[in-house]
């Protein structure tokens, strides 16, 4: 195992892909770092899977994936590998059916994060913002604040209820979602920076509505 790990690490170290990413002024070096750290974390979980505290590694992975979204969406492609490591550890007697189901579930999880959580949170916050400002007449950012208060309340209730009912999988899922959102919250820096009226303020994502357009890359138009 160590020999194969050393061979893989050395092959990547001296590969053209790695050095090209390392010397260019782009996001791919940091993206490679997060991909490596996330996969390292799932291997640490695999070592301690039978430990009562092994869940913390999965929660760490959720947080790192959330943070990595702010670097590059390419990091989400590590999710299928993570799911397969989980499958092979939890189900030693693997089958073709189980392998296929795990692959499908990994794609579904990837789609939920990519097309659901990432745009969904900002879109809902934007809808709340428009409603509470235009329909009710509250000050700017009121809708966004109310949305996140409700989101936090829903997460707290989910954690409390799942713990009370002894639903360990649901509790872990809600906890993973919480840490994914915490990691994803790095995008708030765009709003903070834009409201500071910096000299370079492309597309001015000053609120949830503008951030939604920014994340949707609407500034590039359609081809």
What are these regions (language model features)?
Residues 25, 29-40, 58-61, 77-80:
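Alpha-helical transmembrane segments of multi-pass membrane proteins
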Residues 9-32, 65-73, 115-140:
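Aromatic- and kink-enriched transmembrane "portal" helix at the membrane-lumen/periplasm boundary
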């Amino acid at each position: 195992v160590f020999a194969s790990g050393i061979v893989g690490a050395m092959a990547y170290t001296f590969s053209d892909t790695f050095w090209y990413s390392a010397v260019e002024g782009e996001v791919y070096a940091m993206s490679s770092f997060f991909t490596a750290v996330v996969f390292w974390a799932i291997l640490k979980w695999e070592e301690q899977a039978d430990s009562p505290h092994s869940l913390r590694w999965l929660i760490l992975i959720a947080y790192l994936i959330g943070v990595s979204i702010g670097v590059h969406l390419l990091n989400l492609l590590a999710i299928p590998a993570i799911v397969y490591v989980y499958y092979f550890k939890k189900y030693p007697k693997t089958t073709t059916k189980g392998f296929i189901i795990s692959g499908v579930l990994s794609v579904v999880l990837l789609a939920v994060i990519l097309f659901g959580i990432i745009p969904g949170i900002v879109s809902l916050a934007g809808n709340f913002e428009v409603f509470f400002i235009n329909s009710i007449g509250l000050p700017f950012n009121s809708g966004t604040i109310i949305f996140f208060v409700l989101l936090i309340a829903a997460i707290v209730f989910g954690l409390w209820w799942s713990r009370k009912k002894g639903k360990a999988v649901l509790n872990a899922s809600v906890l993973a979602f919480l840490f994914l959102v915490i990691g994803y919250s790095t995008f708030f820096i765009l709003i903070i920076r834009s409201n500071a009226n910096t000299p370079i303020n492309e597309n001015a994502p000053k609120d949830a509505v503008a951030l939604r357009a920014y994340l949707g890359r609407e500034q590039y138009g359609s081809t």
